[in-house]
A protein has these predicted regions:
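Conserved GNAT-fold acetyl-CoA-binding loop/helix
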Residues: 22-41
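Juxtamembrane/interface motifs at transmembrane-helix termini
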Residues: 33-37, 45-46, 85-86
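Extended aliphatic helical segments
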Residues: 14, 37, 43-44, 99
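A short helix-loop-beta-strand connector motif used in the catalytic cores of GNAT acetyltransferases and
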Residues: 42-55
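Short secondary-structure boundary/capping segments within folded domains
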Residues: 5, 30, 43-46
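Acyl-donor (CoA/ACP) binding surface of acyl/acetyltransferases
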Residues: 1-19, 53, 58-164
């Protein structure tokens, strides 16, 4: 799995994938093309941003998704992990490779000590994140009634992994 700087065209693909899975997101509103371009210019391309995003490539050139280490607290060595894959690559093992690459980037290259995340019970990827967290010796906490989606409340799973 190769991590590369994302391009504006790749982020447009990601926007379309993201808008198909709103129930899984902390901010469940669709993004417009203009919003995504603004995000690319002000966050992704900003070296002073507290967010680092990476285009995920399988092999030499196949773009499969976007990963991030976001909400970075440099002084505390903390970052939140994020991941979105093209629908055609979900469930294929690429997610596991992407998370391993992001964790290595965070711990080995960026000097982070803790990587955390959140996944809602209404997200089919919750089992994926449970397995990944356990494999990396992490800790899981369930937060009841954390996410409101279409009139129903869902629990959230918070997970934390530490540099070994």
């Amino acid at each position: 799995m190769e991590l590369k700087p994302p391009t504006r065209a790749e982020l447009e693909e990601v926007r379309l994938w993201r808008n198909e899975i709103l129930e899984t997101l902390r901010t469940p509103y669709p993004l417009t093309e203009e919003m995504q371009v603004n995000f690319y210019d002000k966050v992704v391309c900003n070296p002073d941003s507290h967010h680092r995003y990476f285009s995920l490539h399988a092999g030499l050139s196949t773009f499969i998704g976007l990963g991030g280490l976001t909400n970075i607290e440099w002084e505390n060595g903390l970052a939140e992990i994020s991941l979105i894959l093209s629908p055609q690559y979900r469930g294929s093992g690429y997610g596991r490779q992407a998370v391993s690459a992001l964790i290595a980037k965070g711990f080995n290259d960026m000097g982070l000590s803790t990587i955390y995340g959140e996944c809602y019970q209404c997200n089919p990827a919750i089992e994926f994140w449970q397995k990944i967290t356990i494999e990396h010796g992490g800790y899981i906490t369930m937060i009841p009634r954390r996410k409101l989606w279409q009139g129903q409340l869902y629990d959230a799973m918070h997970f934390t992994m530490w540099r070994q």
